[in-house]
Amino acid sequence: TRYFSSAASDVYKRQGLQPRAAFGYLTLAVSKIIDVVENSNYVSQLNDVSSYIDKLSENGDESDINKLSIDICESINKKTVIIYSGTDMSRVVSSRWKTQINENAKSKAFIGNLPEVHHNEILSWDADKDGSKKNYIVIFIRDQNEHPQIKKRFELTKDLIGEKVDIIEVNIANQESTLKTLLELVLLGDLVSLNLAAKLAVNPNNIDTIEKLKKLLGG
C-alpha cells in the first residue's frame, strides 16, 4: 500500500499487518512526508532512534525494559487501567498504551489528561474507595518537559487519591531526544500489553469482536 509518493521518495507499508503492528512503517511514512514538505531530517532522527530501540530490547525477555513491563503487568493483572498524562508527548503515549491494552490484552483502559482531570474526574475517586482499590490502577505517564504546574498537579493528584487507588509512575527521560523518550515509552507500553495478554491467556491478534461488529454494521 503506497501512502506517499513524490519525486523524492515512496513509502510502502508491508501487507497483512494490523494497523497497531505497523506503527514503525506508519511513523516512517509520516516522517518522510514531513521531511519533503518542511525540508527537515526526521527520517535521519528515526534511524538513530531505531538503533537505540534495538539496543534496549537486544536481550529479549531478559532486557531491562521487558522486566519493567512485566512488573507493571503484574501490578495491573485484571484491574481496569486509568492512564494520566500532562503534555502533548505523554498524551500520544497514553493513547497508544490504552489502545494496545484494549486490543492486545483485551482489557479495559481509559485515559485522562492534566489539568482536565482536576476539573471533574478527580471527584470520581471519592465514592466506593474499597472498590477503587480492588478494581482500578492508575498509571502516570511523566514527561521531563512538563510545565512546573503540571508537575505540581501530578504530585497533588498522588496525595489526594493515593490512598484510594494504587498508582504507578512511568518516568523515562532521555536527555538527548524527546523522540527517543516517546518511542521508548511506546515500546514499554507495547510490551506491557503483550505480557498482560500472556498473563490473562488471551490472543493479542484476535479481533473477532471488531470483525463481528463490522459485519453487523454492514447489515
Give the location of each predicted region.
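Single conserved hydrophobic/aromatic residue that forms the stacking wall/gate
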Residues: T1-Y12
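Active-site phosphate/pyrophosphate-binding segments
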Residues: V36-N135, L216-G219
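C-terminal active-site/capping subdomain that shapes the small-molecule cofactor and substrate pocket
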Residues: L123-D208
